């Protein structure tokens, strides 16, 4: 993102925000409520249109592309809300995602088994979506997001509504995705969990990036502690 701006009525909620996510890098976009982080995130996703600035994937601008076209060029979005089909099994949920990306025949079955094994969901492959725990659902959702072999994944509140053990599992999955060369952008209200996995973080307030750096740099920033983390924050 380069110099992105967004105004709703008379209020400028995002004011000249720039940040980048590289291949094989996990980046966090954080900040207090009303900071503009969610609007900035949604402009990358394609849910909100910027008033000014540009959004690029590599050297190509994707600012004018709708969500489905962004997915085709390698940008996968995982929303906070449940995105699996509750009345389909885990196996069927993944198959639907593969078919949506035009994968069929033997290749579809082979990719299905690869994803089931990679995300350790073989024991629940015949379980219905409505019967999954929060952590299991997240695993299946990420498996579905990988159906199209994306270059980048956008994770909206990936740690919301799951227990501590599941948080550690999701963090490990994110590390594996990073090791595969996939770039990942995370926005989440669970600050400690997010800073525990990202390589770099941007902290927003009043529509602008106020602090940026590694997890350690952000966690020890006096400015970030003053307006967001609190004086007693520890990683």
Regions flagged by a language model, labelled:
Residues 95, 106-124, 171-175, 223:
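Conserved ABC ATPase "signature" region
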Residues 149:
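Conserved catalytic motifs of ABC-family nucleotide-binding domains
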Residues 153-157:
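Catalytic Walker B motif of ABC-type/P-loop ATPase nucleotide-binding domains
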Residues 45:
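Helix-to-loop junction immediately C-terminal to a conserved catalytic motif
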Residues 30-32:
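The feature captures the beta-strand-to-loop junction immediately N-terminal to the Walker
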């Amino acid at each position: 993102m380069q110099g992105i701006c967004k105004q709703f009525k008379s209020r400028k909620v995002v004011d000249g925000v720039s940040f980048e996510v590289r291949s094989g890098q996990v980046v966090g976009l954080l900040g207090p409520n009303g900071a503009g982080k969610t609007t900035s995130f949604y402009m990358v996703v394609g849910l909100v249109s910027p008033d000014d600035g540009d959004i690029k994937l590599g050297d190509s601008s994707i600012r004018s592309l709708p969500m489905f076209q962004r997915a085709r060029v390698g940008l996968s979005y995982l929303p906070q809300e449940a995105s699996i089909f509750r009345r389909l099994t885990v196996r069927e949920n993944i198959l639907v995602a593969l078919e949506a990306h035009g994968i069929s025949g033997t290749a579809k079955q082979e990719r299905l088994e690869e994803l089931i094994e990679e995300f350790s969901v073989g024991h629940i492959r015949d379980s219905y979506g409505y019967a999954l725990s929060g952590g299991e659902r997240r695993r299946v959702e990420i498996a579905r997001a990988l159906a199209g072999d994306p270059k980048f994944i956008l994770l909206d509140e990936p740690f919301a509504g799951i227990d501590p053990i599941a948080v550690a599992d999701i963090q490990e999955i994110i590390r594996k995705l990073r090791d595969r060369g996939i770039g990942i952008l995370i926005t989440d209200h669970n600050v400690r969990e997010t800073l525990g996995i990202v390589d770099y973080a941007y902290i927003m307030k009043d529509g602008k990036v106020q602090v940026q750096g590694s997890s350690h740099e952000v966690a020890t920033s006096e400015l970030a502690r003053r307006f967001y983390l609190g004086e007693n924050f520890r990683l």
